[in-house]
Amino acid sequence: MKAKEIRDLTTEELRQKVNELKQELFNLRFQLATNQMDNPMRLKEVRRSIARAKTILRERELKQQRA
């Protein structure tokens, strides 16, 4: 996901998305371990999407604390 797409989500949707991405990452790692993975670049994409989402969540938390 792009950062713009992530920013359009509500905070609750964003938390849910992080959980979904973590589950997908777990499944991808399992596929990698069993040599069933079709696209190994998907691991990188999912990890980066999780990082983007967590960064935006943290920005929102800090913004609320300052307000």
UniProtKB/Swiss-Prot annotation:
| Ribosomal protein as UniProt keyword | yes
- PANTHER family, per this entry? 60S RIBOSOMAL PROTEIN L35/50S RIBOSOMAL PROTEIN L29, LARGE RIBOSOMAL SUBUNIT PROTEIN UL29C
Per the record, the similarity remark reads: Belongs to the universal ribosomal protein uL29 family.
The record's annotation in Pfam families points to: Ribosomal_L29
MF terms per GO, please? structural constituent of ribosome
Q: Name one GO biological process term.
A: translation
The entry's cellular-component GO terms read:
cytosolic large ribosomal subunit
Where does the source fall among the domains of life? Bacteria
**Alphabetically ordered keywords of this record:** Ribonucleoprotein, Ribosomal protein
Q: What is this protein called?
A: Large ribosomal subunit protein uL29
